[in-house]
Amino acid sequence: MNATILGQAIAFVIFVWFCMKYVWPPLMAAIEKRQKEISDGLASAERAKKDLDLAQANATDQLKKAKAEAQVIIEQANKRRSQILDEAKAEAEQERTKIVAQAQAEIDAERKRAREELRKQVAILAVAGAEKIIERSVDEAANSDIVDKLVAEL
């Protein structure tokens, strides 16, 4: 064998041993460190994605709850509005009934007063008619006619 080839082989073996002993471990450590950083970054991104999904789900739930609460509040407000309107209508109806009753009472009182006034006037007319009958002293048939007319007027 040739001494040059043997020298090259020994130099190559020493070079490989040197690389394996001093160069390869720092390279592997750097590669492993980089792999760990990438792995940690991916895990962190995955956690962030899960957190984002969870936050979105929570936000959606809270939005649904808020909408439901708003709907309940709106329904309660509508019920209260209807109740207030019904109360106002009932109150207005009572007031109308009261006013109508007062007006009817006033009308009845006025009607009664007018009848009393009319009776007084009829009595005055009856007295005046009786005076005329007495003054004229007409026959019995004429007196009957006058009395019948007075009765008809009453």
From Swiss-Prot:
GO molecular function annotation: proton-transporting ATP synthase activity, rotational mechanism; proton-transporting ATPase activity, rotational mechanism
InterPro entries: ATP_synth_B-like_membr_sf, ATP_synth_b/b'su_bac/chlpt, ATP_synth_F0_bsu_bac, ATP_synthase_B_chain
Superkingdom of this protein's organism: Bacteria
Gene3D superfamilies: F1F0 ATP synthase subunit B, membrane domain
Record key words, sorted: ATP synthesis, Cell inner membrane, Cell membrane, CF(0), Hydrogen ion transport, Ion transport, Membrane, Transmembrane, Transmembrane helix, Transport
Family statement: Belongs to the ATPase B chain family.
Protein name in the entry: ATP synthase subunit b
Organism: Klebsiella pneumoniae subsp. pneumoniae (strain ATCC 700721 / MGH 78578)
